[in-house]
């Protein structure tokens, strides 16, 4: 991992959709997590929002930086009222969690409505300095309906304020990904 760090790597990504929760506080995960925290890397997680109450506490207790992918994937039916999404919001003041604004289409037919309702809540909970945008390219399973330019245009519809967009597009990722400024 140290070799990867010297090459500019800044984190790992876990796609946990449809997979069991890792036991971050046990054995090899605990050791691996300690190394990731020591390197000041992030752990980007794609998981259904109902899982945040179980996933986040052990990671935050170890001092990990976490990026919740796709607005935290709020439940397609309950949207921003989803208890898992609310649990994600409750971690905003820790300073250890970022949320990636990406892939509204992954929240079903009402995805755009859900993320438009989610953005003000995320902004209030995390501040724009802990929100980053992602194109979600190559849009797996949605290649025929989504393009990088459509994904970028979607951000403009979610985040109306130009200064907030600037922070989300440049300042927050520069800090998270350790880009020189």
What is each stretch, according to the model?
Residues 1:
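Catalytic cores of alpha/beta
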Residues 4, 8-24, 141:
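Glycine-rich phosphate-binding "P-loop"
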Residues 11, 25-132:
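Catalytic pocket-lining loop regions of alpha/beta-barrel enzymes
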Residues 106, 139-141:
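Short, active-site-adjacent cap segments at secondary-structure transitions
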Residues 121, 126-132, 141-181:
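Mid-to-C-terminal alpha-helical segments outside catalytic/metal-binding sites
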Residues 136:
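Active-site glycine-centered loops adjacent to acidic/histidine catalytic or metal-binding residues
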């Amino acid at each position: 991992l140290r070799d990867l760090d010297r090459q500019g790597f800044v984190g790992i990504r876990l796609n946990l959709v449809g997979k069991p929760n890792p036991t971050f506080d046990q054995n090899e995960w605990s050791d691996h997590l300690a190394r990731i925290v020591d390197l000041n890397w992030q752990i980007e997680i794609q998981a259904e929002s109902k899982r945040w109450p179980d996933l986040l506490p052990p990671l935050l207790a170890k001092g990990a930086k976490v990026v919740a992918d796709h607005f935290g994937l709020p439940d397609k039916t309950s949207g921003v009222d989803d208890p898992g999404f609310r649990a994600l919001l409750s971690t905003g003041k820790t300073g250890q969690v970022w949320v990636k604004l990406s892939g509204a289409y992954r929240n079903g037919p009402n995805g755009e409505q859900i993320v438009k309702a989610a953005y003000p809540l995320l902004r209030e909970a995390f501040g724009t300095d802990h929100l980053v945008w992602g194109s979600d390219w190559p849009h797996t399973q949605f290649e025929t309906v989504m393009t990088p330019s459509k994904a970028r245009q979607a951000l403009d519809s979610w985040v109306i304020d130009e200064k907030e967009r600037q922070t989300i597009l440049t300042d927050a990722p520069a800090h998270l990904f350790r880009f020189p400024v």
